[in-house]
Amino acid sequence: MPGLDGFGIRARLEEALLYLCTDARTERGDLAEFADAALDGGVDIIQLRDKSAGGAPLEARHELAALEVLAEACVRHGALLAVNDRADVAMAADADVLHLGQDDLPVELARRIVGDQVVVGRSTHDVVQADSAATEQGVDYFCTGPVWTTPTKPGREAAGLELVRHTAEHRGHGRPWFAIGGIGMDNIDEVVQAGARRVVVVRAITEAEDPRAAAAALRTKLG
């Protein structure tokens, strides 16, 4: 929630179970209503991730405008606002969370831009990356996956439930981590049984007819 200090953001992260990535919903024009519904249903963290089929991100001014809408919703619901990839945009948007992929800006350099108050997350796709992110200086949480193949990451091979099991067994009591990739109501039980307490979802909520109900159903599965 924009306005929290680093301690408050990290305390909220520890409690977070359900993390949502969404595009700006430009064609639908319902970003504010969608965000309110998803957050009301139980989403703890909402990240703007809007890329074209070719992988190009939104122009900065459009990204900041969408983030402003999400920030207002986060304030209303006590949720955390996340920015994907861009440390400069995270700083400009006063985001709570910056999420970095393996090929993005190094954590040390990102920290120079966003400072120590912002939570920084890492994407991991195999055991070596997950083990590294679990101890990497400057990282607050990490994601493991994709558990299953997903159109939001075309061409990326699924890591499967084995990565979830490994992380739960060897890194389950350290910094927070989330399973990600193709997770929905049809398979979330498998992810939980493999040891995940927290998940990241996309289509399970963004494509739902009732985002509030979809979020609530997923949240119930996580306890």
Swiss-Prot record:
Source domain of life: Bacteria
CDD domains: TMP_TenI
InterPro entries the UniProt entry points to: Aldolase_TIM, ThiamineP_synth_sf, ThiamineP_synth_TenI, TMP_synthase
Entry annotated with the keyword Magnesium: yes
Listed pathway(s): Cofactor biosynthesis; thiamine diphosphate biosynthesis; thiamine phosphate from 4-amino-2-methyl-5-diphosphomethylpyrimidine and 4-methyl-5-(2-phosphoethyl)-thiazole: step 1/1
Catalytic activity: 2-[(2R,5Z)-2-carboxy-4-methylthiazol-5(2H)-ylidene]ethyl phosphate + 4-amino-2-methyl-5-(diphosphooxymethyl)pyrimidine + 2 H(+) = thiamine phosphate + CO2 + diphosphate; 2-(2-carboxy-4-methylthiazol-5-yl)ethyl phosphate + 4-amino-2-methyl-5-(diphosphooxymethyl)pyrimidine + 2 H(+) = thiamine phosphate + CO2 + diphosphate; 4-methyl-5-(2-phosphooxyethyl)-thiazole + 4-amino-2-methyl-5-(diphosphooxymethyl)pyrimidine + H(+) = thiamine phosphate + diphosphate
Binding site for Mg(2+): D85, D104
GO molecular function list: magnesium ion binding; thiamine-phosphate diphosphorylase activity
Function: Condenses 4-methyl-5-(beta-hydroxyethyl)thiazole monophosphate (THZ-P) and 2-methyl-4-amino-5-hydroxymethyl pyrimidine pyrophosphate (HMP-PP) to form thiamine monophosphate (TMP).
Family statement: Belongs to the thiamine-phosphate synthase family.
Designated name of the protein: Thiamine-phosphate synthase
Lineage, top ranks: Bacteria, Bacillati, Actinomycetota, Actinomycetes, Pseudonocardiales
Gene designation per UniProt: thiE
